[in-house]
Curated annotation (Swiss-Prot):
Family: Belongs to the shikimate dehydrogenase family.
Active-site residues, record numbering mapped to chain: 73 (proton acceptor)
Species for this entry: Brucella abortus (strain 2308)
Gene3D superfamilies from the UniProt entry: Leucine Dehydrogenase, chain A, domain 1, NAD(P)-binding Rossmann-like Domain
Catalytic activity: shikimate + NADP(+) = 3-dehydroshikimate + NADPH + H(+)
Official protein name in the record: Shikimate dehydrogenase (NADP(+))
Pathway: Metabolic intermediate biosynthesis; chorismate biosynthesis; chorismate from D-erythrose 4-phosphate and phosphoenolpyruvate: step 4/7
């Protein structure tokens, strides 16, 4: 029996609350059509108080698995009977699947972050030092990716220093916490600068100047933002003006979807320019570029 036959009729989902904004159905729908797989992927809105019962009834509802987004990533971590290494390190689950009747959880955000940089800025992981702006939930996946790829020194800056200290304590050696006031001084020796804050994203002062001068960064430094709405954030615009190589956040969204699709439907999809243009067209239609 070939992979397409095995995947026939399989169902997967993305769940969050709210979920109407998700572009995951567009991504997976594109791959299902491209690969000729008779499966489905749907958005399912689940309230926080209903998540545990939803997770427990995946098999009964005919799902092979699915993606989990805000605010359910920690609840999915708690619900999973088995966790992959990335999920354990990050403390959150964004991908669920059933294996021999057991609910398994993984986290593909770190994979997606690194794969996006591999595709758009190959050699990025030669940087000895990285600067991560922000210490929210998303920054954990970024830090895990950096450590996994051998970055020697990761500086995390945050307006609330205790959040950065908590993150540094979680990951241990090679991760250092700093206050936001120290960010400017840290730019000068950072080979990779990652923005994980909401500064510059839609609804968070996207028209304003990013509050850090990037002109003193090493000329070979790479700057990337995990935000993809808008595609060109205030941070990326400033990095570009400073002459840095920039990588937008859309690729992270696309690449993080790959492992889950392969688990549910049995074929590994490719992140192509055609897929990117498909999502960009939807973003343009929604006025989200």
């Amino acid at each position: 029996m070939d992979d397409k036959s095995m995947a026939r009729g399989r169902k997967a989902f993305v769940t969050g609350f709210p979920i109407r904004h998700s572009r995951s159905p567009l991504i997976h729908g594109f791959w299902l059509k491209e690969l000729g797989i008779d499966g489905s992927y749907e958005a399912v809105e689940v309230k926080p108080e209903d998540f545990s019962s939803f997770a427990a009834s995946l098999a009964a509802n005919g799902f092979a698995g699915g993606n989990v987004t805000i605010p359910h990533k920690e609840a999915a971590y708690a619900a999973a009977e088995s966790l992959d290494e990335a999920a354990r390190a990050i403390g959150a689950v964004n991908t669920l699947w059933l294996e021999n009747g057991r609910l398994c959880g993984g986290n593909t955000d770190a994979y997606g972050f690194a794969a996006n940089l591999d595709a758009s800025a190959p050699g990025w992981d030669k940087a000895d030092r990285a600067l991560v702006l922000g210490a929210g939930g998303a920054s954990r996946a970024v830090v895990h990716a950096l450590l996994s790829r051998g970055v020697c020194h990761v500086s995390v800056v945050n307006r609330t220093l205790s959040r950065a200290e908590e993150l540094a304590a979680h990951f241990g050696a090679r991760v250092y916490a700093h206050s936001w006031d120290e960010a400017q001084a840290l730019v000068s020796n950072a080979g990779l600068i990652v923005n994980t804050t909401a500064l510059g994203m839609s609804g968070h002062g996207e028209g304003q100047d990013f509050p850090i001068d990037l002109t003193c960064a090493p000329k070979e430094a790479v700057a990337t933002d995990i935000v993809y709405v808008p595609l060109r954030t205030a941070f990326l615009n400033k990095a570009e003006k400073a002459g840095l190589k920039t990588v937008d956040g859309l690729g992270m969204l696309l690449h993080q979807a790959v492992p889950g699709f392969e688990r549910w439907f049995g074929q590994r999809p490719q992140v192509t320019q055609a897929l990117r243009e498909h999502i960009l067209a939807d973003m343009a239609k929604a006025g989200a570029l």
